[in-house]
A protein has these predicted regions:
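Sec-dependent N-terminal signal peptides
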Residues: 1-25
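Compositionally biased, proline/threonine/alanine/serine-rich low-complexity intrinsically disordered stretches
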Residues: 27-55
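Short coil-to-helix leader/linker segments, especially the first N-terminal amphipathic alpha-helix
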Residues: 48-68
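A short glycine-rich, aromatic-capped structural motif
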Residues: 67-133, 151-154, 234, 241, ...
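Residues embedded in well-ordered beta-strands
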Residues: 76, 111, 190, 238, ...
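Functional-site microenvironments in short loops/helix caps that host divalent-cation chemistry
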Residues: 84, 88-94, 137-145, 151-285, ...
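Short, solvent-exposed beta-strand edge segments and adjacent coil->beta transition regions
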Residues: 99-101, 107-109, 143-146, 214-216
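Short, structured beta-strand segments at or near domain termini in extracellular proteins/domains
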Residues: 296-308
Length: 308
């Protein structure tokens, strides 16, 4: 990857490099930063560690959690519902590809990773013969419960393929609509917690956390959102299933991934990261990378389709 490539007139310099944005794409040059002095432990994981039976799956209700193997991601059940996707033109930081706003209806509950996929979870995949045996660099920040980084969209797809095979269940990446619905958790504000970035709500370039513009934080280091999900914005960017379109004209209204009518060599990323300015953490913000990009602020979380 060509780092620090100036592909646009819009540039926001962020400590270790400059973040460039054009036509929905973000590129950046980064460097290892001085580590913070303190680490906040993540919440304890669920004790469930076996594939759900059909009866157990049908009994699930919103905010229930489950794990389908010892090293599988902990999943949180998200309710069905409708929301307004995108942002109004009046929202600070709004870009044209966040419109037009439109109603999306998620007809069935589904499960979302309670946390971003961690190094522990990724390394278990590689050790089990999955993930193409790839061991991404942790930049010297540590592995364990930190989110996996330096993974491409292709890498993320290899992980969900392994997870699906291991559990016999339908794991996948989130659609962009599912992501925004789960991030907003019933809100229509710029951020999941309000219209201002505030202090210590997330890990970004200027979020007031001990990790800001330095490195990733252990997953679960900040308060959960209204659906009980952690780090839905900030910490690491997250790969989506969708291809990139420059507006929502013609977007699906059912929450499914939008893969028609676009160059799918590039896929949507959401959430912002430890390296990005606060505006990139807005619930509606969207941009894209080519599927082979591996960056030290880029990771993912998983979703799972549930039985009706």
């Amino acid at each position: 990857m060509a780092q620090g490539l100036a592909i646009a007139a819009t540039c926001s310099c962020i400590v270790a490099g400059c973040l460039f944005v054009a036509d929905g794409q973000a590129q950046a040059q980064t460097a290892t930063q001085t580590p913070p002095a303190q680490v906040t432990p993540a919440p304890a994981a669920s004790t469930q560690a076996a594939p759900l039976s059909p009866m157990q799956e049908k009994a699930l209700k919103p905010k229930d959690t489950f794990k389908e193997c010892a090293n599988c991601p902990e999943m949180m059940v998200v309710p069905a519902g409708s929301f307004t996707m995108g942002s109004p033109t009046s929202e600070p930081g709004h870009s044209a590809d966040e419109g037009p706003q439109h109603t999306v209806t998620i007809a069935r509950q589904f499960a979302v990773g309670r946390f971003e996929v961690t190094f522990d979870e990724w390394d278990a995949c590689a050790a089990d013969g999955g993930c193409n045996g790839y061991k991404p660099s942790d930049e010297g920040w540590g592995r364990g419960r930190r989110p996996v980084i330096n993974v491409s969209w292709d890498d993320a797809k290899a992980y969900v393929a392994w997870l699906s095979k291991k559990t016999g269940k339908s794991y996948r990446l989130l659609s962009a609509a599912e992501y925004e619905y789960a991030t907003r958790a019933g809100t229509q504000t710029a951020y999941p917690w309000g219209n201002a970035v505030g202090t210590n709500n997330a890990n970004c370039h200027a979020c007031g956390s001990q990790w800001d513009a330095r490195q990733t934080a252990p997953v679960g280091s900040f308060a959960a959102n209204g659906f009980g999900l952690y780090d839905m914005v900030g910490n690491v960017e997250e790969w989506m299933e969708d291809c990139y379109h420059d507006s929502y004209s013609g977007a699906p209204a059912d929450g499914s991934a939008w893969i028609e009518g676009a160059d799918c060599s590039s896929r949507i990323v959401r959430a912002g990261s430890w390296f990005f300015a606060p505006a990139f953490l807005r619930s509606a913000k969207r941009y894209w990378f080519t599927t082979d990009y591996r960056l030290n602020y880029l990771g993912f979380r998983v979703a799972r389709t549930l039985a009706p």
